[in-house]
Design a protein with these regions (language model features):
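A structural motif detector for short, solvent-exposed N-terminal "entry" segments of globular domains
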Residues: 102-145
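Short, surface-exposed charged micro-motifs
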Residues: 59, 114-116, 174
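Short acidic, glycine/serine/threonine-rich helix-capping segments at coil-helix boundaries
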Residues: 31-94
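N-terminal low-complexity, Pro/Thr-rich disordered segments
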Residues: 1-46, 53, 104-105
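A mature extracytoplasmic/lumenal domain signature
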Residues: 84, 88, 96, 121, ...
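Exported/periplasmic cell-wall-interacting domains
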Residues: 78, 99-112, 146-152, 156-229
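Extracytoplasmic/secreted envelope proteins and their assembly/folding machinery
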Residues: 45, 49, 65-68, 89, ...
Length: 229
């Protein structure tokens, strides 16, 4: 079920994001706050170790911390203290996907446009045949109890200045594909410890670009499961 928006299209434009909203700021537990190079293993330790070519043991070593800290410094993730949190993992997954977009060949290649959503890696892209028409970006999908529905869907309603009737919050560049689940922009960090309430969240700039790529009737294919959900 999709409830009508609180505001009509164009009646009240959704707010623009604040400056600096796309900065990469890592989520830290108290034990890692203030450390120059943390000894605490991060929630995404194994994933980050694998992506950075480190020994995958889920334990934080001095070498691990130095390597993760160097990666964070290079990618302008703050604070750069070696903690393997959701922001560091998301950035590492994105860079890996730019080199090898779909290693498992999970997204079907069709003659028509398909929005590919990989819940395992929290990534999405759009392709038409062999051509990628919207490059891979980080996303945030549904949390526990609000799983983003997998399988085939179609974009059936697009509403640029959407306000949620359920949560009374702006959902810029909404493109609905399954009931109340939609691609839409959020204000702030995409890579967070908890997920969305079912929608596929994108950074504001990426959602705006996706708006110009997808059309009503375009297909959406979703697979996998959000880590921790």
């Amino acid at each position: 079920q999709v409830l009508p928006p609180l505001q009509g299209e164009g009646d009240v434009p959704v707010p623009e994001p604040e400056e600096g909203v796309d900065e990469l700021v890592e989520y830290l537990p108290r034990s890692a706050v203030g450390a120059a190079c943390t000894a605490t293993a991060g929630a995404y330790q194994r994933k980050v170790e694998r992506l950075l070519g480190l020994v995958v043991d889920g334990k934080q070593s001095v070498a691990d911390c130095k390597a993760i800290k160097a990666f964070q410094t290079r990618e302008k993730i703050k604070p750069a203290n070696g903690y393997a949190g959701p922001v560091t993992w998301a950035r590492a997954e994105l860079l890996a996907a730019r080199k090898d977009l779909d290693p498992g060949r999970r997204c079907p290649v069709k003659k028509y446009a398909v929005a590919c959503v990989d819940l395992d890696r929290q990534l999405m892209w759009v392709r038409k045949g062999k051509k990628v028409t919207f490059g891979v970006v980080n996303i945030r999908s549904g949390r526990v109890g609000y799983a983003t529905r997998t399988g085939w869907h179609s974009v059936y309603w697009r509403h640029k200045d959407h306000w949620s009737s359920i949560y009374n919050t702006p959902m810029p560049y909404s493109q609905f594909f399954s009931g109340g689940q939609a691609f839409h922009a959020v204000y702030g960090q995409i890579a967070t410890p908890t997920g969305s309430r079912g929608c596929v969240n994108l950074g504001y700039g990426n959602a705006r670009k996706l708006w110009d790529v997808l059309r009503k009737g375009d297909r959406v294919y979703i697979w996998g499961k959000r880590p921790g959900s």
